[in-house]
Amino acid sequence: MSFGLRFVMALILGALTADMFSLRGREEDKLRIESLKPGRQVCLIEPMLLPVALAMGMVFFLLWGGVQALGRFAANLWLLFFQIGVYYALLLLVLAPLRRAVSARACAALWLVPGLLYFLVWIVMDDDSRPLAVLTLPKDLFEPMFAVWLLGFLGLLVWQMVSHLQFRRLLLRDAVPERDEALLEQWHAELRRHGVRRDIPVVVSRQVSTPLTVGCFLRTMRLVLPGRHYSREELELIFCHELRHIVRRDTRTKLFLGFCTALCWFNPLCWIARRRASDDLELSCDEAVLEDADEATRRRYAELLLQHGASGRGYTTCLSGAAQTLRYRLSHVMKPAKRLSGGLLVGAAAFALTATAGTLSLADAAGPARELLFEGQTQTPCVQRVFVSSWREDMRLSRKVFGFDEAALTEFLGSLRIREIYAGAQGRELPFGTRCLDIDYEIPGQEGLIRLTLSDGVLTADLPDDGRGEIACLVEEEGP
């Protein structure tokens, strides 16, 4: 994909994301005066799109091209994971001023923006654009490092799933259905007001000290209450808080954040980012529930938070949270400040991620070009033809070269120090007017030609019977 096309696509996606964020916000604001339409989505994006797209991509490339194609796809995905890790690290650095400047809803949405990269999974392969940065990783080391990463990823993913299921089983093992008719009537009324189509059972469990919702899908969700009495006003605040999580699909957002943490398990910043993101999800619901609330309601809500200090585990959402975040939430509840909506910021983040996705490269260690081009040939390749080419508007103009020294040309090409690009941006895209040197070698007794193109620090090679297609290499320096 050319840089121009990528830039335009990023602009469109950024604008659509900002508009979608504002649209979802307006939909959610309707809850102040009316009910949501049944099934209405108010989250920025379905959190599980990226994990599903990655799984489908792996299956497709495995079936289409076998283990070799899957390996190339995995190498390209590594760069995508690296970008997500960098994004979360940068977001952590600016999180404190962002929380003071923009709404908690925008801060929560920023953690979900990498999910928009799901459609780029299919176009990260063999991108022709020039790389913004090149990461050097010898190909001999990639396979063992990938194996270590894969073991860590799968191990952490399984551990998270098992931990969640064990916690869910612990919560529901001794839970009993709620029997209070007035409470259930109030709960069902709030379900209808929030546009939730399916009934979500309410249970009481001795294992919890704070109200929470467990389950990633409506059919598996349960609202779990501790065994204590609540007034009607307290129940309204509790139900509104938990239903905001439900209509925003926050339990699946936590599943997505856990998936991203597993992808970047070697990066400690991603573990910190996961905790900060969970805090922002709670702050965002506090903000939504208490919008336009009077001081008495805010005080009642703050008392509920203080009475229910607990830490959420697994893929759950809970009214209160860990002690280290409670002080910050109480400050926001009792002293609300005017903040920007943050829609433009969310759109700008989507633009930046899309514009830079696929612009990194993984390259092999530097070595002489002859090792890649000529070694292993049973016969000495002979130059068949040489052209000098350049792009002018929509045409490629070529001029054949005569009278060259074949031995000197071959020695020059073989002495170039190159780094083979085996993942990410290939650098084949050339600006208009760039001149290229095209050399075709024929191998006696063998079909096919070795086709080389040297231009602007990039050497591309199409080797017969290689099976990898056109190979792009970065030229570090000329030979002696």
What positions do the PLM features span?
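Basic/polar, acidic-poor N-terminal "presequence/leader" segments
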Residues: 17-21
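Serine/threonine-rich low-complexity intrinsically disordered regions
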Residues: 2, 26, 37, 138, ...
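Intrinsically disordered/low-complexity terminal segments and short unstructured peptides
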Residues: 127-128, 452
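Hydrophobic transmembrane alpha-helical segments in integral membrane proteins
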Residues: 1-16, 71-81
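Function-determining sites in protein domains
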Residues: 366-480
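Membrane-embedded and juxtamembrane structural elements of multi-pass membrane proteins
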Residues: 22-53, 60-127, 134-362
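Charged interaction patches that mediate protein-protein contacts
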Residues: 2, 358-365, 461
